[in-house]
C-alpha cells in the first residue's frame, strides 16, 4: 500500500488476486498491508459507492496512475447489510474469514446457495409451517426422512418477571423468559448469513437470536433490556396519541387499534 503521487486521499495498492498481482488505485480509509479485500476485476458490475445503477469496472487511469480493478466496499457489491461498514470510504475487510487470494467471494462468504421461496398464503391455517423447522418436519413426514430434533433446555426456577396480558381478546398468550449475564456483541457469522439470506438485516447477537428463533419455528420473539423495563411487561391496546420509538429511532404515533408491548411507563414495542 503506497501513497498516490498526485492525490492525498488515494493509495496505490499491489493486490495478489491468486498467483498474480494487480495494481489498483483505491481511496479506502482503512487500507493496510496484508489486508484481505474484495476485488472487482475489469468486466465486473458494481454500484459506485453503493448508489445508483450498476457500472462495469474497466481498466483506467486515476490521477495519472493505471488501475486494473477496484477494491470494493461491501455496499458496492450488494453486501452492505451483511458486512456493514464503520464509516464512509471503508472497504470490506475480510480479516475474520479463512480465505486465500483469488478465491471467489461467494465461496468465502457462503453465498453460493439455493434459496427456496415458499408462498404461505395457501397455508394460513397451518401456523406450524410458518417456520423453517415446520417445513422440515412436514417434508420429513411426507418422505419418511429423519428429522433432527430441536433440543429442549431444562426448566429452571421461577423468576420474578411480571408478565401480564391487558387485552385477552387480541392476545391470548404472552410469555416471558428472563436471562441473566448477557451482553451485546456480534452474532456468529453463520447466523448473520442465514438471517441475511432470507431478507433480514443482522443487528447484534441479541436481536439476531430473536429473529433466528422466529424464522426457525415461526414464533415471533423480542428481547428487552430488563434495566429499561419498569415494574412489569404487558400486551395491551395502545392509547390514542401514545408515542413509540422504533429500533431505527423513528418515532411513531399510536392509536387504539394498535396492540403494543408496554411497561408501567408506556409502550416499549409493537406486538
Predicted regions and their residues:
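Loop/turn positions that initiate beta-strands
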Residues: 34, 203, 257-259
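Residue "hotspots" at secondary-structure boundaries inside conserved domains
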Residues: 29, 252-253
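Glycine/proline-enriched, intrinsically flexible loops and inter-domain linkers
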Residues: 2-5, 11-13, 143, 147-243, ...
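Phosphate-backbone binding interfaces of nucleic-acid-interacting proteins
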Residues: 1-153
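A structural connector/turn signal
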Residues: 26, 248-249
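Catalytic nucleotidyl-transfer cores of nucleotide-processing enzymes
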Residues: 256-270
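A generic structural signal for residues embedded in beta-strands
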Residues: 39-41, 254, 262
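Short acidic-glycine loop/turn motifs at beta-strand connectors
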Residues: 17-20, 239, 263-266
Amino acid at each position: 500500500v503506497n501513497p498516490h503521487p498526485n492525490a492525498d486521499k488515494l493509495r496505490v495498492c499491489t493486490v495478489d488476486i491468486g498467483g498474480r498481482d494487480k495494481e489498483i488505485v483505491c481511496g479506502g480509509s482503512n487500507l493496510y498491508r496484508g489486508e484481505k479485500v474484495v476485488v472487482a476485476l475489469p468486466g465486473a458490475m458494481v454500484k459506485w459507492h453503493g448508489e445508483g445503477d450498476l457500472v462495469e469496472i474497466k481498466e483506467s487511469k486515476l490521477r495519472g496512475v493505471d488501475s486494473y480493478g477496484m477494491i470494493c466496499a461491501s455496499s458496492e457489491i450488494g453486501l452492505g447489510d451483511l458486512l456493514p461498514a464503520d464509516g464512509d470510504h471503508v472497504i470490506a475487510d475480510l480479516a475474520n474469514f479463512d480465505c486465500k487470494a483469488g478465491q471467489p467471494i461467494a465461496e468465502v462468504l457462503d453465498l453460493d446457495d439455493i434459496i427456496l421461496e415458499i408462498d404461505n398464503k395457501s397455508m394460513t391455517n397451518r401456523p406450524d409451517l410458518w417456520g423453517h423447522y415446520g417445513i422440515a418436519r412436514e417434508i420429513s413426514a411426507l418422505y419418511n426422512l429423519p428429522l433432527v430434533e430441536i433440543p429442549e433446555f431444562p426448566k429452571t426456577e421461577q423468576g420474578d418477571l411480571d408478565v401480564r396480558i391487558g387485552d385477552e381478546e387480541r392476545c391470548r398468550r404472552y410469555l416471558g423468559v428472563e436471562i441473566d449475564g448477557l451482553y451485546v456483541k456480534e452474532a456468529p457469522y453463520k447466523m448473520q448469513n442465514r438471517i441475511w439470506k432470507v431478507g433480514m438485516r443482522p443487528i447484534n447477537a441479541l436481536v439476531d437470536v430473536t429473529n433466528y428463533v422466529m424464522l426457525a419455528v415461526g414464533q415471533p420473539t423480542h428481547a428487552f433490556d430488563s434495566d429499561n423495563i419498569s415494574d412489569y411487561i404487558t400486551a395491551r391496546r395502545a392509547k390514542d396519541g401514545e408515542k413509540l420509538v422504533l429500533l431505527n429511532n423513528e418515532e411513531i404515533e399510536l392509536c387504539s387499534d394498535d396492540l403494543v408491548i408496554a411497561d408501567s411507563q408506556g409502550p416499549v414495542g409493537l406486538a
